[in-house]
């Protein structure tokens, strides 16, 4: 019988076990009769419930029943005592009927319970409330009987309800846990072969029941302090009353079963987790080896241009994006498997490691294929980028070579040649880079066969190889054509440089001849003070003329070279109508001037030679006539020289030039005149002795 069923009756406190004990350690059962009408049925139910609480060992020590009749009638008391005979005759050892003062002494003295002892089965005594201590210790009596034992019926009832609830829940929970645990032991092998669908859970939370039991046990074990007199008394919830050992036993059983249950749950959770992991692993593996591999199996091209390679890269990025989702699942699964491996369940290690190894192998193989494909496409894009740059460079170089240049001078030609060489060097570097990129791409394509999954990729690879080699060969041919054109352009420009150089040097020769002519007119003025000096001047003049002749010949050769170069270059020399006439004109002027200079020096030499001969000799008298003729001749030559100094040099174009300045001519003429005077004076000296002889 549960307290909850008869809770309204129990709340009436028709009887109670206070927790007190008699001198034989038997429990004290108190029946507080009231003046109100007491229901014997309810009292019987209450007694049945209370007497079901103590253990058999406790019952064997017997009960002492206190029937408090101080507020009741004798008939009721008598009925209760007789009822005890029917309810608990074996357990009752003594019944203490607390009588009212001076009431029953007169009315019922004729009734002696002791006479009924054999029939009742227990001893009944009438005692006053203040005389109970003769039979029971004061600390085992409640306050209404003058004792110090504290009893709170509602507190006891509440704890009793808790106890019964705990007992009921724990017993039910133990049965449920036993079913779960035993079922798990029997079906453990089968559960490994099928998905776990046994999710049976206890009807109550084991943690809550355990907590309730611990709290109840704590209440049962604690002591209470009586605040009124400072004495210590046992709680009415004594272990003999509420079966503290029973609570402890239930708790121990619960802990044991709950521990097994937790292990079962852990094993089932682990099994479920393993099955889920295996399912997810197979999902990842099946997708990577199925649709994922098929996506890569269809992607073998490298594109034939930058745009095509970029489109393939974009397609590959979409494939990578799809793979990334599965790789994320792989990372999560790998972490879960690692956590389970760290848990160290030996029976699952082999299975977990097998799953992990297979998952890792598939994912790493697929990731390697993706990376290889990405690297291949990037290399192809780099190759096409280099090819496009090289093609643009070749187009630019070819365009530059196809345009006929007309440089104005050698510096411009040198600059153009330098630019051509730089472009050709850049093209050569670009072609070398293209070869390196192409060879790297060819190597990668060769290795691509290892990812073929059995597919024949020879056709795709051959197309890719032919495309790469075709681009490299085409670029090589275009470069070779450009090199040939550069060689032709270089030769032409070098000839143009030579042409410009010849023209410049020819113009320089004209300038030099002008300078020589100018020097001849302005500085080659003196005719010498004597024959020796005149000879020296004449010799210097011949050398001077040789220099001018060499300059003129050099200019003529340069102009002839320009004619040849112009014929080779199929162009018109800028010097053909300008420099050559200038050269011829200045050379003609120089020749005329030089001849005039030579003529004057020769006349001066003849004058000085004859004059010196006359002035240095002392002829005999027989030669006088001839000497006079020489004098006249010398004088005539001297005058001719003087006359010649005043004559300008007349050129074919009608222009005239004088040697030196008028002062220079005057100085030269003055010296000639001095010589003429000396000759005349010599002549006079010769004439005077002759006249003296005649006179004598």
Swiss-Prot record:
Spectrin repeats lie at residues 272-378, 381-494, 500-602. One of its GO terms (biological process) is blood vessel morphogenesis. Residues 1-153 form the CRAL-TRIO domain. Transmembrane segments: none annotated. The keyword Repeat applies. Keywords: Repeat. Pfam families: CRAL_TRIO_2 (PF13716), Spectrin_SESTD1 (PF24915). Belongs to the SOLO family. PANTHER family: SEC14 DOMAIN AND SPECTRIN REPEAT-CONTAINING PROTEIN 1. May act as the primary docking protein directing membrane turnover and assembly of the transient receptor potential channels trpc4 and trpc5. Binds phospholipids. This is SEC14 domain and spectrin repeat-containing protein 1. It comes from Xenopus tropicalis (Western clawed frog). The gene is sestd1.
């Amino acid at each position: 019988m549960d307290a909850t069923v008869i809770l309204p009756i129990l709340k009436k406190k028709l009887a109670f076990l206070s927790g007190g004990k008699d001198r034989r350690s038997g429990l004290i059962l108190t029946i507080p009769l009231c003046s109100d009408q007491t229901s014997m049925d309810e009292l019987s139910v209450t007694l049945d419930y209370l007497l079901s609480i103590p253990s058999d060992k406790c019952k064997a020590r017997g009960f002492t029943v206190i029937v408090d009749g101080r507020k009741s009638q004798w008939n009721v008391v008598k009925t209760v005592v007789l009822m005890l005979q029917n309810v608990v005759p074996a357990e009752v050892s003594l019944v203490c009927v607390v009588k009212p003062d001076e009431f029953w002494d007169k009315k019922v003295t004729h009734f002696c319970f002791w006479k009924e002892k054999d029939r009742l089965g227990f001893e009944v005594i009438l005692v006053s409330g203040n005389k109970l201590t003769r039979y029971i210790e004061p600390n085992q009596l409640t306050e209404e009987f003058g004792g110090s034992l504290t009893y709170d019926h509602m507190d006891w009832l509440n704890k009793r309800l808790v106890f019964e609830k705990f007992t009921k829940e724990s017993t039910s929970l133990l049965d449920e846990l036993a079913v779960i645990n035993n079922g798990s032991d029997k079906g453990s092998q089968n559960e490994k072969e099928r998905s776990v669908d046994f999710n049976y859970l206890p009807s109550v939370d084991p943690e809550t029941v355990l907590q309730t039991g611990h709290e109840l046990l704590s209440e049962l074990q604690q002591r209470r302090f009586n605040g009124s007199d400072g004495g210590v008394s046992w709680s009415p919830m004594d272990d003999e009353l509420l079966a503290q050992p029973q609570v402890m036993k239930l708790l121990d059983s619960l802990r044991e079963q709950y521990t097994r249950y937790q292990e079962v749950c852990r094993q089932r959770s682990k099994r479920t987790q393993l099955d889920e992991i295996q399912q997810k692993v197979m999902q990842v593996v099946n997708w990577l080896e199925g649709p994922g591999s098929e996506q890569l199996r269809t992607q073998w091209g490298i594109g034939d241009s930058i745009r095509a390679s970029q489109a393939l890269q974009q397609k590959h990025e979409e494939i990578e994006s799809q793979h990334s989702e599965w790789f994320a699942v792989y990372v999560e699964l790998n972490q879960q498997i690692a956590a389970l491996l760290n848990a160290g369940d030996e029976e699952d290690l082999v299975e977990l490691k097998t799953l992990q190894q297979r998952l890792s192998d598939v994912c790493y193989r697929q990731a390697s294929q993706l990376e290889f494909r990405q690297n291949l496409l990037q290399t192809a894009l780099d190759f096409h980028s280099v090819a496009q740059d090289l093609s643009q460079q070749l187009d630019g170089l070819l365009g530059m070579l196809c345009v006929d240049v007309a440089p104005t001078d050698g510096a411009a030609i040198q600059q153009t040649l330098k630019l051509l060489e730089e472009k050709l060097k850049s093209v050569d570097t670009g072609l070398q880079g293209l070869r390196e990129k192409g060879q790297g791409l060819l190597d990668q394509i060769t290795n691509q066969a290892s990812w073929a999954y059995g597919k024949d990729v020879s056709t795709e690879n051959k197309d890719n190889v032919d495309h790469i080699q075709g681009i490299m060969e085409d670029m090589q041919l275009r470069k070779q054509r450009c090199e040939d054109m550069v060689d032709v352009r270089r030769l032409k420009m070098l000839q143009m440089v030579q042409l410009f150089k010849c023209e410049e040097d020819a113009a320089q020769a004209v300038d030099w001849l002008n300078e020589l002519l100018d020097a001849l007119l302005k500085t080659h003025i003196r005719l010498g003070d004597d024959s020796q000096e005149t000879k020296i001047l004449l010799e210097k003049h011949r050398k001077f003329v040789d220099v001018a002749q060499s300059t003129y010949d050099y200019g003529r050769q340069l102009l002839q070279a320009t004619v040849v170069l112009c014929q080779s270059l199929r162009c018109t020399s800028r010097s053909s109508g300008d420099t050559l006439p200038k050269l011829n004109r200045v050379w003609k002027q120089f020749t005329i001037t030089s001849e005039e200079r030579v003529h004057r020096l020769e006349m001066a030499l003849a004058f000085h030679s004859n004059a010196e001969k006359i002035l240095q000799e002392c002829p005999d008298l027989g030669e006088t006539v001839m000497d006079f003729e020489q004098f006249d001749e010398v004088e005539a030559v001297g005058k001719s020289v003087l006359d010649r100094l005043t004559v300008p040099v007349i050129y074919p174009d009608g222009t005239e030039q004088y040697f030196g300045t008028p002062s220079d001519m005057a100085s030269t003429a003055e010296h000639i005149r001095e010589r003429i005077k000396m000759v005349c004076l010599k002549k006079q000296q010769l004439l005077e002795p002759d006249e003296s002889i005649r006179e004598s």
